[in-house]
């Protein structure tokens, strides 16, 4: 059996605040700018510019290009973009930790012969570092991040990419996530079984008529269920 996991809100408990003054003041200092709020407006304008170029709503642009544009606007080498992106993320982040049982669950699934994959709507310039920080990068058989492949869940194309990249069959895959729209709706429609866990980061979709194959109340139950399915 192959288990495909969402990251944020499913395996990792995260909270960020991209509006707080400390973020924009810190970024302004890094760029030798005086007006932190003007810098925020510039960032949002560049994001909006890239967003408007998308062919459809589930196309995922790479946020690193925004940081490259901000640097280029100031005559600074684009090579500094990953460093600026890391600073942005660290300053915006208020919490990042694994949910209970996650490391043990991933390790036991792999030990039992299951395939363990990460399929996340995320920005690679943030997420690759955070996977290392959480010490779980090496626990997956494969990783697909939406900004790297240009499309996000629930669009079927991201599941096409995952199955082709890792030579998987959807009948042998179970998708695990905390979002009824991005995770359950997409994987259900694709023909995979789904496991849903509600966490603080779960979206609210009162009008969405979607039912997961399984629902668990906590990560201890998730671990038991997935091991029983393998």
Predicted regions mapped to residue ranges:
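Asp-based, Mg2+/Mn2+-dependent phosphohydrolase catalytic module
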Residues: 1-3, 13-14, 29-37, 79-81, ...
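N-terminal helical cap/lid subdomain that shapes the substrate entry/recognition surface
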Residues: 1-100
């Amino acid at each position: 059996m192959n288990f495909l996991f969402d990251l944020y809100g499913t395996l990792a408990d995260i909270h960020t605040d991209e509006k707080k003054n400390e973020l924009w003041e810190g970024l302004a200092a890094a760029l030798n700018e005086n007006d932190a709020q003007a810098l925020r407006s510039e960032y949002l304008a560049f994001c909006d510019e890239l967003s408007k170029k998308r062919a459809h709503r589930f196309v995922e642009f790479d946020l690193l290009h925004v940081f490259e544009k901000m640097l280029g606007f100031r005559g600074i080498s684009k090579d500094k973009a990953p460093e600026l992106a890391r600073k942005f993320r660290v300053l915006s982040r208020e919490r990042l930790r694994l949910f209970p049982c996650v490391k043990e669950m991933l390790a036991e699934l792999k030990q039992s012969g299951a395939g363990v994959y990460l399929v996340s709507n995320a920005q690679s310039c943030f997420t690759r570092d955070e996977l290392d920080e959480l010490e779980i990068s090496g626990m997956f058989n494969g990783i697909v991040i939406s900004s790297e492949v240009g499309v996000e869940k629930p669009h079927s194309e991201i599941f096409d990419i995952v199955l082709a990249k890792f030579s998987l069959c959807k009948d042998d895959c179970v998708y695990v996530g905390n979002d009824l729209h991005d995770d359950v709706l997409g994987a259900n429609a694709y023909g995979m079984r789904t496991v849903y866990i509600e966490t603080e980061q779960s979206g609210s979709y009162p009008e969405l008529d979607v039912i997961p194959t399984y629902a668990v109340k906590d990560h201890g139950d998730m671990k038991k269920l997935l091991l029983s399915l393998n």
